[in-house]
């Protein structure tokens, strides 16, 4: 109460921020007349003037009013669009490292040009992050005209680009790309063996478009680069035979009494977490079946250490058969299982689920099973985006997640007022008893809209639902277009024309996101088609464009008079934000519009979270079939259920981050070491430190610290030095001749002998020649052990929750054991590098070159690289990418063709590659 009174007196934090920003907007507006008088060249020259002022030490905040005014004037000339004052507010918010919530149709893409231009003046690069490649390419081309006019360069960062193309994209003043691609480039840059192979040039400033989708929806799944592991095809096929022989338990057992089970069975399903659990009976049934299949011994159990992998495969088969359904979670095309994005309904070709789930689905569908993957590098979006010096974002729906943005990323949300107040009528939900009644009511609403000419957008949560609506509309003979994964190449064009008279569009959730639905259709698209028509002369084009404008204006007014775009949704999503995004497609820029959700008690969200309460209301009211509940209490009940799901998903993301923070600290150390090694001119200090550490550990095994002579094993130390390290050191003789010798004296002699042996080796070939070999050995050892460490952390993470049963804190145990594992990693690198460099037999520079080339070949040989990344569903999905293999240096597999240093140069000069184009590297 007191808080509300204070807010009314002083205004909210958001109100105070906007008040401050409006003063800056007044200063920008005051410059408009002055800049209108400038010629194009004079306006463009302002960019270099600003760059010089920034280089001289002037703050960006001081330049902001002038820079924003320049962008507005440039946009008026090039884009024929003038930034509204509210877009200026959004731009200031983005420059200050905040999230700008701007409603659909308010021009977020144009708003971003303001802070992008300002921050690009530093010359350190600006990254604009979009949700998909289509939007990255579209926005880069669209806004690139403005940036180029103002004298800035623009690059597009897409998957499967060559190293040179990516370097050019990152070296531009402004780079457009997807969140996944930026993250993968960061990981790949920390896997290369040559400084010149890196593509990124530092993480200065990023603006994330659809920030809620990228930093919230996709943050439950890390980015993973992996390589193929051992083949388990037979195991997946065998486990697929086990699942049909198991039965589902009905009812939940009370953990205290064991009561509550109505029908015993082998497994239970938790739909909330999408997990399957074997019961005690299920374990016994599975063990019996596996014994009959010859996969385990008669007395063996699934908990035996030798059978841990069987458990992994069995649970993957259970999830594949019981939780993942064809045409809802995936489709089968050309003998392959292709994942469907549950949020957008798009097909995610080339991507794969991880943890053996994809292979289990392949076994279930009877298609060819492809191999599992081993993690080579990994990072979460939370930790990747926190690497940027400054981060900002924009979306139409951030306020519901404002707490999470602040808690996880330290990002404040600023709600920007709309340019025109929304006139959309968001009607109360209608809840029916059955799915059939729900669809009948929705179809009736669609028919009424069609008969009066009002355009309709029907939103569904899956391809399956969109196909049901499709079939029902076909039956009713209502013309319509379906926008789902099976034709996503045309989705932007379909969405653009969804606001025309009598048009019915079925869309799976947010398919076509980023494209405005304009009432009367998208005039710009029609004009573009005319301008691209080479068969028409200029006069004919102008006449046709004038005709199109007149027809569009007439249709635009007709649609407005009919009530604008009608949104009809057939299901509530888990997140209120996704529902708000669907509603936001209507009523843009002050246009009229309306929305209605048609629900049933059979919908997943209702069934799991809110069904009982609503069902009780229906029964009390004795609702007849076909009648719906339409009341505020029902809508509030559903939103309460959504809040529960959102809170659970937030906890999942926060827990993921807490565990990944441990790995992130270690990742920073490893990547910093790699970069130091690659950038260093000399590695003598690092190699000497590793060597001393290695021989200290070795010596202390035979001559413990602060020990007396009787505890020493000098003979054993001499033997190991000679046999394993080829160092002949007569310590026993010196011990007899010396009057007094301590354990420290012995250690010094061993280290000195090792240093001499190493110096002799280097002297034969020359330190300069040896440095590159040292660099390769160090990098390969770090990479190999880091990959093994990632696997170890993954296994540790999967089983750490069991420590809770021993009254231990799982997170603390994870931190402690991860720290111990990291110590083992550093010891392994130290010992391996020292061993290789001390024992390798090299007598000449030519032999050194051969050894280095062999190591490079081993490093760059790889059978497959796969990239696992999340989509808006938060599910892990993987794509195979052969085109970037040459940029990623990994061990094991089939060699990728490359030119050896001593091979003839491909240019045809007849010289060796190292003496010709190899010098360029």
Curated annotation (Swiss-Prot):
Main location: membrane
Taxonomic path: Bacteria, Pseudomonadati, Pseudomonadota, Betaproteobacteria, Burkholderiales
Gene coding for it: secA
Protein name as annotated: Protein translocase subunit SecA
Record field: catalytic activity: ATP + H2O + cellular proteinSide 1 = ADP + phosphate + cellular proteinSide 2
Domain of life: Bacteria
Membrane topology: Peripheral membrane protein
Cofactor: binding comment: May bind 1 zinc ion per subunit.
SUPFAM superfamilies cross-referenced by the UniProt entry: Helical scaffold and wing domains of SecA, P-loop containing nucleoside triphosphate hydrolases, Pre-protein crosslinking domain of SecA
UniProt keyword annotation of Protein transport present: yes
Keywords, sorted A to Z: ATP-binding, Cell inner membrane, Cell membrane, Cytoplasm, Membrane, Metal-binding, Nucleotide-binding, Protein transport, Translocase, Translocation, Transport, Zinc
Subcellular location: Cell inner membrane; Cytoplasm
Cofactor(s) listed in the protein's UniProt record: Zn(2+)
Subunit structure as annotated in this protein's UniProt entry: Monomer and homodimer. Part of the essential Sec protein translocation apparatus which comprises SecA, SecYEG and auxiliary proteins SecDF-YajC and YidC.
Residues that bind ATP: 87, 105-109, 516
GO-annotated cellular components: cell envelope Sec protein transport complex; cytosol; plasma membrane
Residues noted as binding Zn(2+) in the record, renumbered to the chain: 905, 907, 916-917
Function according to Swiss-Prot or TrEMBL: Part of the Sec protein translocase complex. Interacts with the SecYEG preprotein conducting channel. Has a central role in coupling the hydrolysis of ATP to the transfer of proteins into and across the cell membrane, serving both as a receptor for the preprotein-SecB complex and as an ATP-driven molecular motor driving the stepwise translocation of polypeptide chains across the membrane.
Organism: Polaromonas sp. (strain JS666 / ATCC BAA-500)
EC number: 7.4.2.8
Top-level class of the enzyme under EC nomenclature: translocase
InterPro entries listed in its UniProt record: Helicase_ATP-bd, Helicase_C-like, P-loop_NTPase, SEC_C_motif, SecA, SecA_CS, SecA_DEAD, SecA_motor_DEAD
Coiled-coil segments on the chain, per record: none
One MF term in the entry's GO annotations: ATP binding
Family matches, as NCBIfam families: PRK12904.1, secA
CDD domains xrefs: DEXDc_SecA, SF2_C_secA
Family of this protein: Belongs to the SecA family.
An example Gene Ontology biological process: intracellular protein transmembrane transport
